[in-house]
């Protein structure tokens, strides 16, 4: 899912 990557990677990263 693109949303998971965006939230996980952007928020978490």
UniProtKB/Swiss-Prot annotation:
<keyword id="KW-0430">Lectin</keyword>
<keyword id="KW-0862">Zinc</keyword>
<comment type="similarity">
    <text>Belongs to the calreticulin family.</text>
</comment>
<dbReference type="GO" id="GO:0005788">
    <property type="term" value="C:endoplasmic reticulum lumen"/>
</dbReference>
<dbReference type="GO" id="GO:0046872">
    <property type="term" value="F:metal ion binding"/>
</dbReference>
<keyword id="KW-0143">Chaperone</keyword>
<dbReference type="GO" id="GO:0030246">
    <property type="term" value="F:carbohydrate binding"/>
</dbReference>
<keyword id="KW-0106">Calcium</keyword>
<keyword id="KW-0479">Metal-binding</keyword>
<keyword id="KW-0256">Endoplasmic reticulum</keyword>
<protein>
    <recommendedName>
        <fullName>Calreticulin</fullName>
    </recommendedName>
</protein>
<comment type="function">
    <text>Molecular calcium-binding chaperone promoting folding, oligomeric assembly and quality control in the ER via the calreticulin/calnexin cycle. This lectin may interact transiently with almost all of the monoglucosylated glycoproteins that are synthesized in the ER.</text>
</comment>
